[in-house]
Amino acid sequence: MKSTIFFILSLLLMLENQAAGRRLSGSAGAQDPVISRVWAKSQDMEEAVSGSGLTAEGGRGSDREESVGERVSLRQEEFEKGHIRSSVEEPEGEHVSVRREHLEKSHIRHNVEEPEGERVSVRREHLEKSHIRHSAEEPEGERVSVRHERVEKTHKRFHDDSVEESDSASSVDHRKKGHIRFKRQDPIAALAAIEGQDAVKDSLWVKGQASSEERFSVKGQDLVKGHLQMKGQSSLAERFSVTGQDSVKGRLQMKGQDTLAERFSMTGQDSVKSRLQMKGQDSLSERFSMTGQDSVKGRLQMKGQSSLAERFSVTGQDSVKGRLQMKGKDTLAERFSVTGQDSVKGRLQMKGHDLLEERFSVSGQDSVKGLARIKGQESVQSGFSVKGQGSLKGLI
């Protein structure tokens, strides 16, 4: 009697598993290697979804929408488990979510032609788990979030009438966890954060005409390389921070016409190399600070026409080398201070037409070498003081 009941229960369980497999294959497309294609068009009043595969069931449905044209196409191979959901709201509300596991190649393209032109394309190869969500709200609200594990190549492109932005990230090694979130409003605010364990190489390029705010942060354990270029006409505010354990290399170039405010800070344990160039016409304020344990090398060049205020401070334990060049036409005020334990070398050159005030102070324990040159046409005020315990050589 017990064996008969057990046999009946096992048979019912097998039938239930087969029915669940049929439902899953009907909703996702396929479980084994499958080539499927989904088209969704809603230009005037039409939307069609079709799927074909080895063990997939095809379906066709229609939905109506007004005043929005969009196109979504998906193509993938070796699709294990997948869930595709698409819903369209009115007016200008669009929500597309894709969730899949272990697909080899995929291509997603989204085009909206009326009334606003935008383009989002994602191309990746061999990702284990991914989740893509895209929603558009009114007015001009757009959000794209991508979360994936073990991504080889990723490419995303966003195009609009007034602003063109491109964000690309590629990793040679395997990335553990990544999250990219993009928000766009009026004015534009963009946030991009990438966290990796092995190696990360990123390049970000932003161009804007009206106003732009951008934050970029990279955290890694082994090796981090970043390159950032920003150009703007009206106003530009930017923060760039890099934190690493082994080696950090960063380069920053900023150009602006009206106002420019920038902060640059770097902290590392082994070696830090940085180069900063800034050019402005109206007003320029800049702070540059570096802290390191082993070796620090910094170079700063600043040019301005109206007014210029700058502070430069370097603190290190082993060796410090600094070079500062400043040129101005109207007024110029500058402070330069160096503090170190072993050896300090500094060189200062200043040229001005109207008024020039300069202070130079050096404190060290072992040896100090300094060279100061000042040239002016109308009036010059200079102070030079040196304190040291070992030896001192100075030439004015």
UniProtKB/Swiss-Prot annotation:
InterPro entries: SVP_I. The keyword Metal-binding does not apply. SVP-1 clotting repeats lie at residues 194-217, 218-241, 242-265, 266-289, 290-313, 314-337, 338-361, 362-385, 386-396. It is found in: Secreted. Residues 177-192 form a propeptide. SVP-3/-4 repeat repeats lie at residues 65-88, 89-112, 113-136, 137-157. GO terms for biological process: mating plug formation. One of its GO terms (cellular component) is extracellular region. SVP-3 may be a post-translationally modified form of SVP-4. Residues 194-396 are annotated as: 9 X tandem repeats of SVP-1 like motif. Residues 1-21 form the signal peptide. Keywords: Cleavage on pair of basic residues, Copulatory plug, Repeat, Secreted, Signal. SVP-1, SVP-3, and SVP-4 are 3 of the 4 major secretory proteins, secreted by the guinea pig seminal vesicle epithelium (sve). SVP-1 contains 8 and a half repeats of 24 amino acid clotting domain. SVP-3/4 also contains 4 repeats of a 24 amino acid domain, but which is unrelated to that of SVP-1. SVP-1 serves as substrate in the formation of the copulatory plug. SVP-3 and SVP-4 may also contribute to the clot. This is Seminal vesicle major clotting proteins. It comes from Cavia porcellus (Guinea pig).
